[in-house]
Regions:
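A short, structure-level motif marking secondary-structure boundaries and short turns
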Residues: 65, 69-72, 111-114, 131-132, ...
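Active-site neighborhood of HAD-like aspartate-dependent phosphohydrolases
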Residues: 2-62
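Short coil/loop linkers at secondary-structure junctions
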Residues: 46-50, 95-98, 156, 188
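Short, acidic loop-to-helix structural element flanking the phosphoryl-transfer center
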Residues: 91, 97-140, 175
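A metal-dependent, Asp-based hydrolase signature
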Residues: 60-109
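A generic "structured core" feature
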Residues: 32, 117-121, 177-178, 209
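Asp-based, Mg2+/Mn2+-dependent phosphohydrolase catalytic module
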Residues: 1-17, 125-130, 136, 141-231
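Flexible, glycine- and charge-enriched loops at secondary-structure boundaries
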Residues: 29, 33, 79, 171
């Protein structure tokens, strides 16, 4: 079920729309099934790469729980967020940071682009086009790099932010990322709307900034109901 927290009567009364990407602008469940099949085929063709998949598994867990793992890390002043996470995973798996980085780039950034387009959410894609037609500001804010995925999905935004940006440097639900965006556009919190797929990440980050939000359901059937907000 969609979770909607709006103080304004009309969604078009907001000035800035901040969208999450993964699981929001495309349907994540069928995409992950397709990616799993792709990875299995890749491992059969490249058996030595199986260790990299365990590295990726660890990396995803570390990023998901970075609020916990980050406290164990003492390199905050020396490296960027991405570098710290690569180094942490490397220390846990007994490999180099470069190997972690290479595995992330291949399996999480490059390979998904080959299978992603069919899973685009046309409902939110249409909303973004409508917002642009009305000269609204569209921002993408994700914990992962976004530019290549946006291009792959055929979606254009006015600005893109990731948790690894130098002026953010923290993962959702830390409120800093949204605060940076609001400051960049000189926007009051009551004039911004966050749209994501996870309350525990996107919703809480929005709440901590006093920003309204919509948490979209994972099903197409439920997402269709959102059209009533802007039709």
């Amino acid at each position: 079920m969609n979770r909607i927290e709006l103080k304004k009567n009309n969604i078009m009364d907001y000035d800035i729309f901040i969208f999450d990407l993964d699981g929001t602008l495309y349907y994540q469940k069928p995409f992950r099934i397709k990616m799993l099949c792709t990875l299995i085929k890749y491992v059969f063709a490249h058996p030595m790469s199986i260790k990299d998949l365990f590295i990726i598994k660890e990396y995803r867990e570390v990023r998901e729980q970075w609020e916990k793992y980050g406290k164990e890390d003492s390199s905050a002043e020396k490296m960027s967020l991405d570098e710290r996470q690569y180094a942490y995973v490397a220390s846990q798996k007994g490999v180099t940071s470069e190997r972690v980085k290479h595995a992330v780039e291949l399996f999480m950034l490059e390979m998904p682009l080959r299978v992603l387009p069919p899973y685009r959410d046309e409902i939110l894609g249409d909303l973004i086009q409508k917002l642009k037609d009305k000269k609204k500001t569209v921002v993408i804010y994700s914990d992962y790099p976004v530019e290549d995925k946006l291009k792959c999905l055929g979606i254009a935004a006015d600005a893109c932010y990731t948790s690894g940006d130098a002026d953010i440097g923290c993962m959702k639900p830390d409120p800093k990322g949204i605060r940076v965006i609001l400051n960049a556009f000189n926007c009051e919190s009551n004039n911004a709307l966050m749209i994501g797929d996870r309350y525990e990440k996107d919703g809480i980050a929005a709440e901590k900034n006093g920003v309204d939000y919509i948490i979209v359901d994972c099903s197409k059937k439920e997402r269709r109901k959102l059209r009533d907000l802007w039709s």
